């Protein structure tokens, strides 16, 4: 008798427990805890940085790596992201950092990013990244590299726009289908109840 309440309580706690992130959702070589992704102190570079992170990531740790820049659009694909730890990286302040600087400029909590300093080029060494002007970043790149970086950023934004449009189209299609099913169900119920109502009315008149 006493074991049943304990068993019911255990089942209730299991049902109320927050779902854990599946192992496949955590990119190697990072470690994940709930919506926090820790990729710090992994020796990551531009080439070895994971191509994507779980979309529900709220905190991303990239400190103490060998990152000189981030792939364009990487942080923009994380709508729930609230904080990114970017310190202790050898940031090269050129046109490839324009997407990161734009992302930082739109963050309300700028105090977390005031320690990001440029390591290269020599003209910008020691400068705080959030306070480096866009023109200075563009000037640090060759024209060809600047055009290539802009093209990559535009392609990333285009892909994101297409994905959003596709999701919106699927949602609208689903809503139309549900509305049509509800309308058909209502028509079917009316066709079934109408003869009964007519029969009841006829019986009362006789």
UniProtKB/Swiss-Prot annotation:
Residues 1-26 form the signal peptide. Residues 172-206 are cytoplasmic. The modification Phosphoserine is found at residues 186, 191, 200. InterPro entries: Cys-rich_flank_reg_C, GPIb-IX-V_Complex, LRR_dom_sf, LRRNT. It is a single-pass type I membrane protein. GO terms for molecular function: identical protein binding. GO terms for cellular component: glycoprotein Ib-IX-V complex. GO terms for biological process: blood coagulation; blood coagulation, intrinsic pathway; cell adhesion; megakaryocyte development; positive regulation of platelet activation; release of sequestered calcium ion into cytosol. SMART domains: LRRCT, LRRNT. It is found in: Membrane. Pfam families: LRRNT. LRR repeats lie at residues 60-83. It comes from the Eukaryota. SUPFAM superfamilies: L domain-like (SSF52058). Residues 27-150 are extracellular. Residues 27-55 form the LRRNT domain. The chain crosses the membrane at residues 151-171. Disulfide bonds join 26-32, 30-39, 93-118, 95-141. Platelet activation apparently involves disruption of the macromolecular complex of GP-Ib with the platelet glycoprotein IX (GP-IX) and dissociation of GP-Ib from the actin-binding protein. Gp-Ib, a surface membrane protein of platelets, participates in the formation of platelet plugs by binding to von Willebrand factor, which is already bound to the subendothelium. Two GP-Ib beta are disulfide-linked to one GP-Ib alpha. GP-IX is complexed with the GP-Ib heterodimer via a non covalent linkage. Interacts with TRAF4. This is Platelet glycoprotein Ib beta chain. It comes from Rattus norvegicus. The gene is Gp1bb.
């Amino acid at each position: 008798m006493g074991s049943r309440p304990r068993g019911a309580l255990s089942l209730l706690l299991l049902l109320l427990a927050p779902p854990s992130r599946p192992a496949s959702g955590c990119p190697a070589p990072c470690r994940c805890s709930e919506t926090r992704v820790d990729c710090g102190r992994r020796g990551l570079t531009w080439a070895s940085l994971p191509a994507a992170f779980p979309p529900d990531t709220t905190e991303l740790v990239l400190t103490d790596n060998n990152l000189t820049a981030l792939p364009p659009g990487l942080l923009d694909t994380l709508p729930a992201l609230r904080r990114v730890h970017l310190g202790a990286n050898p940031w090269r302040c050129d046109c490839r950092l324009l997407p990161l600087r734009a992302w930082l400029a739109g963050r309300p909590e700028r105090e977390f990013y005031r320690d990001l300093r440029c390591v290269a080029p020599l003209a910008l060494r020691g400068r705080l990244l959030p306070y480096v002007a866009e023109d200075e970043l563009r000037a640090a790149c060759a024209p060809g590299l600047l055009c290539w970086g802009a093209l990559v950023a535009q392609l990333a934004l285009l892909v994101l726009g297409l994905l959003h449009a596709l999701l919106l189209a699927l949602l609208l299609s689903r809503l139309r289908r549900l509305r049509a099913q509800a309308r058909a169900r209502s028509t079917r119920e009316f066709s079934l109840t109408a003869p009964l109502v007519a029969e009841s009315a006829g019986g009362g008149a006789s």
